[in-house]
Amino acid sequence: MALNTIDELIEDIRQGKMVILMDDEDRENEGDLIMAAECVRTEDINFMVKHARGLVCMPMTRERCERLGLPLMVQRNGSGFGTKFTVSIEAAEGVTTGISAADRARTVQAAAAKNAVAADIVSPGHIFPLMAQPGGTLARAGHTEAACDLARMAGFEPSGVICEVMNDDGSMARRPELEAFAAEHGIKIGTIADLIHYRLIHERTVERIAEQPLDSELGHFNLITYRDSVEGDVHLALTLGKVCAEEPTLVRVHNMDPLRDLLQVNQPGRWSLRAAMTKVAEAGSGVVLLLGHQIGGDDLLAHVREIASAPAPAPKATTTYSTVGAGSQILRDLGVRKMRLLSAPMRFNAISGFDLEVVEYLPAE
């Protein structure tokens, strides 16, 4: 079955219809029904509950969550993909038990209204808001961000309603079942990767602001500076030699850490900045990408205590989904396409939307 284009999906969202969006097979490998929150009716919620069977959630921007006074459900997110659930909600007026399709639609309408305020909703309730990462799918390739992107691109408030599609036996529907579901119900279907690629053509959240040579004790690198227009963070790319799209590039994506990087504190199982730069210098070409993040005094103090504690077992590689988008945009700008990644194997979502592919993982030596 041929997938629909992003323009086709946007048009259906604009008409108040649902679409199906799939993510990567190496992530959740699921498909969600998605529609703009402003367009939700009772029959839409009923369709989701009856036919899709997943959890009905309401993605919205950080700004809307703050305006509605919605704190995160937990302060320390332990979920595998960093999905930011807030406390559940109910419309303050116009509902009875809150669980009926009509009541849930009313709750969505109350929270999605352009002039909605905290007094319009109460907690707990039967709708589960999700806080989207600023920058949308260019920052985090999840259904939460995709729903906000599609609603915004269709001319609505950047807020949606999503529901995972499940099979009759309760298992998650994968691509073959999702395509059959879409055909049966006349719903257009696409991928998050295609949405990312579409947005990259029309908009970006990271821009190159400076470039200069850098003579270090580990080699002669080229230093390129980028700024994230959403978060305001500054990221640095150290390149050596020629980057060729047709050939795999040696790449290290490194979250800047003032203690470990400057004091050269060893962390078992992870590439240090020095080791990564040395590896690239020995290879004669490659990219070391340094992702910068603002760190407060309390965070720094907690980090010092963590380093001072007893050595922990070698950590497993994990993905910080909020930084994958910025890093992917930068690598794409540098001309990287295929990567030999200095990292233990980890899962990414929809990096194919950035025209990137990991062909080999190189764990820390």
Swiss-Prot record:
Protein name: 3,4-dihydroxy-2-butanone 4-phosphate synthase
EC numbers, comma separated: 4.1.99.12
Domain of life assignment: Bacteria
Keyword Cytoplasm: no
Region: GTP cyclohydrolase II-like, residue numbers: 202-365
Pfam families: DHBP_synthase, GTP_cyclohydro2
Pathway entry: Cofactor biosynthesis; riboflavin biosynthesis; 2-hydroxy-3-oxobutyl phosphate from D-ribulose 5-phosphate: step 1/1
Stated role: Catalyzes the conversion of D-ribulose 5-phosphate to formate and 3,4-dihydroxy-2-butanone 4-phosphate.
Binding positions (Mg(2+) 1): E28
Site (Essential for catalytic activity): H126, E164
Keywords: Lyase, Magnesium, Manganese, Metal-binding, Riboflavin biosynthesis
Cofactor(s) the protein requires to work: Mg(2+); Mn(2+)
Region DHBP synthase, residue ranges: 1-201
Binding site for Mg(2+) 2: E28, H143
Gene3D superfamilies: DHBP synthase, GTP cyclohydrolase II
Organism: Pseudomonas aeruginosa (strain ATCC 15692 / DSM 22644 / CIP 104116 / JCM 14847 / LMG 12228 / 1C / PRS 101 / PAO1)
Binding site for D-ribulose 5-phosphate: R27, E28, D32, R140, A141, G142, H143, T144, E164
InterPro entries reported for this sequence: DHBP_synth_RibB-like_a/b_dom, DHBP_synthase_RibB, GTP_cyclohydro_II, RibA-like_sf
Catalytic activity: D-ribulose 5-phosphate = (2S)-2-hydroxy-3-oxobutyl phosphate + formate + H(+)
Family indicated by similarity: In the N-terminal section; belongs to the DHBP synthase family. In the C-terminal section; belongs to the GTP cyclohydrolase II family.
BP GO terms, sorted: riboflavin biosynthetic process
